[in-house]
């Protein structure tokens, strides 16, 4: 229901002959659908439908922006760039278009924001954090005023900055993460209902960096709860993944860590991000196999214990 005005704007635009505005409205509708966790398969079908319309009407600018979103989905769904899912040109966005776009601020910002999604999702946290260092935290807000992607971009850069701080031990990354966290907290205070799960995960990352494990665990669990309640499948997956990595690297609770990572892979796959799910499973295959081996040993031990009890009982009855 909240997206209905964008569909109405699309209809009004075509009825009045303002097809440019109509198609920009539908582009924003597609972006919101992505942010809200819509199934990637369903979203891809909508993108392809409206892209054909944009190209038929020769609306090049909005078609280019929509193509960047299409490229993002193609990579996530394992339909393109299988060898390197963070490469941001291919089936939907040609290398030539990509090179041209890099020289145009508005289009370049569009590429940067969706490319940043891939960098965070595929664990390229230092690269993502360095982009923030290069462009500044308000780059997207200055080049694409009022785009809803500002919320997600700030959140993902914050996650990557805290992750980069933990990977490198460099506190300046954590300071950048705190800048992103502070911005989101201000939005929450002003009544934005769409970023509370972002706030919770950044709280968890901040507490993890500070070594406050109990507080971090509570915030990770809150991020998972809020993401799940809101239907944000991708954010549920990311929060679960970050929680799993937190346990493996910081609390050394391998059982909980493996469980959370397996849940994350399941959530990624349910959303349609098969490339991401497979990447996560490959990266953690050793931990997964160790967990399976441990579970098997526990089962065998339990079986032996029960069998021994049974035979002891029979002997006792027979005596």
Which residues fall in each region the model found?
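Hydrophobic, small-residue-rich alpha-helical packing segments that form membrane-like cores
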Residues: 1-39, 45-58
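Low-complexity, compositionally biased segments
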Residues: 21, 45, 49, 238, ...
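Compositionally biased, low-complexity linear motifs
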Residues: 27-38, 249, 283-296
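Helix N-terminus capping/helix-initiation residues
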Residues: 39, 92-95, 310, 316
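Helix-coil-helix junctions within alpha-helical repeat/solenoid scaffolds
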Residues: 41, 47-290
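Intrinsically disordered or compositionally simple regulatory linkers and C-terminal tails
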Residues: 282-318
């Amino acid at each position: 229901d909240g997206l209905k005005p964008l569909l109405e704007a699309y209809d009004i635009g075509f009825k009045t002959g303002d097809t440019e505005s109509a198609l920009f409205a539908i582009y924003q509708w597609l972006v919101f659908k992505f942010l809200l966790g819509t199934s990637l398969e369903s979203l891809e079908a909508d993108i392809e439908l409206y892209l054909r319309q944009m190209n038929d009407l020769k609306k090049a600018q909005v078609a280019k922006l929509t193509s960047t979103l299409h490229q993002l989905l193609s990579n996530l769904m394992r339909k393109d760039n299988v060898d390197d899912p963070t490469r941001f040109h291919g089936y939907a966005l040609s290398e030539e278009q990509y090179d041209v776009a890099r020289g145009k601020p508005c289009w370049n910002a569009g590429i940067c924001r969706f490319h940043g999604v891939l960098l965070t999702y595929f664990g390229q946290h230092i690269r993502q954090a360095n982009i923030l260092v290069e462009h500044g935290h308000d780059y997207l807000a200055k080049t694409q005023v009022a785009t809803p992607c500002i919320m997600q971009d700030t959140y993902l850069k914050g996650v990557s900055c805290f992750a980069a701080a933990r990977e490198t031990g460099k506190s300046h990354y954590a300071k950048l993460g705190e800048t992103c966290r502070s911005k989101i907290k201000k939005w929450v205070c002003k009544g934005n209902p769409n970023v509370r799960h972002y706030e919770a995960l950044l709280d968890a990352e901040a507490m993890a960096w500070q070594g406050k494990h109990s507080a971090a665990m509570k915030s990770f669990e809150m991020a998972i709860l809020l993401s799940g309640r809101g239907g944000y499948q991708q954010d549920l997956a990311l929060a679960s993944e970050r929680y799993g990595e937190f346990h493996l690297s910081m609390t050394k609770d391998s059982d909980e860590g493996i469980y959370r990572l397996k849940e994350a892979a399941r959530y990624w796959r349910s959303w349609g991000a098969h490339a991401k799910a497979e990447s996560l499973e490959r990266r953690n295959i050793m931990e997964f196999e160790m967990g399976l081996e441990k579970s098997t040993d526990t089962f065998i031990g339990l079986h032996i214990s029960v069998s021994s009890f049974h035979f002891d009982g029979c002997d006792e009855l027979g005596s």
